[in-house]
């Protein structure tokens, strides 16, 4: 059995790491490179960096901090934010990122997934999906440009349909960002993740809702995801990554230690 991964997420806005609740009301939590170094030292398996306003503001990730992170840490990391061309992706990989993630640009132009996969291989192409539960239709739907409240909009896609579409086009991993759960620390959306797991043939990363160590155990055991992403519990020191890994190991979860 492949080891499960613990993935701290660093949302970046105006050069700082920030964290909000349900993608809103972001507060500054620290500087990019020191936080990345701290999580690497604590035992994170990889890191994800989201420049949360890049797509909404029609710009791309600042490559300067990408190179500084690469110089400082020795674990894989993924970057996302406004990447919509082969050249932009190549630049981020050249500056040290191991993977690139696309979200809103893929919704605008789904063929981007195929072009990136053809150029770099599917192993480094991650698709982020911002999914929310729509009570009116009793279904999960996908939103776009979620890093800026004024720019956020609904899309035509139901989450399950978009999951199948991005796999068909060649993505290597999927991060399912459950907007309703984001930052509230009440647990991952096990129901939605379990539904997606049934139709997802690539590694699936859960995002949104971690508040206790038991939440990580549950998402691995019940939803059978490959990795669990979290932010506020790590930023605020609620959970130590090393202690979390020991807890998971003691509960028979295959984990790198």
Swiss-Prot record:
The cross-references to InterPro entries, in alphabetical order and at most eight, read:
Aldolase_TIM, His_biosynth, HisF, IGPS_HisA/HisF, RibuloseP-bd_barrel
**Keyword Cytoplasm included in the entry's annotation:** yes
Q: Where is the active site?
A: 11, 130
| Keywords of the record | Amino-acid biosynthesis, Cytoplasm, Histidine biosynthesis, Lyase
Q: Name one GO cellular component term.
A: cytoplasm
Record localization: Cytoplasm
Pfam families assigned:
His_biosynth (PF00977)
User: Mind telling me which CDD domains this protein's record contains?
Assistant: HisF (cd04731)
> Which GO molecular function annotations are given, in alphabetical order?
imidazoleglycerol-phosphate synthase activity; lyase activity
Gene3D superfamilies linked? Aldolase class I (3.20.20.70)
Highest taxon listed in the record's lineage: Bacteria
Reaction(s) catalyzed by this protein?
5-[(5-phospho-1-deoxy-D-ribulos-1-ylimino)methylamino]-1-(5-phospho-beta-D-ribosyl)imidazole-4-carboxamide + L-glutamine = D-erythro-1-(imidazol-4-yl)glycerol 3-phosphate + 5-amino-1-(5-phospho-beta-D-ribosyl)imidazole-4-carboxamide + L-glutamate + H(+)
Main location per the UniProt record: cytoplasm
Query: Which GO biological process entries does UniProt record here?
Result: L-histidine biosynthetic process
Give the record's subunit note. Heterodimer of HisH and HisF.
Looking up HAMAP family in the UniProt record yields: HisF
Q: What does this protein do?
A: IGPS catalyzes the conversion of PRFAR and glutamine to IGP, AICAR and glutamate. The HisF subunit catalyzes the cyclization activity that produces IGP and AICAR from PRFAR using the ammonia provided by the HisH subunit.
NCBIfam families (UniProt xref): hisF
Q: What is this protein called?
A: Imidazole glycerol phosphate synthase subunit HisF
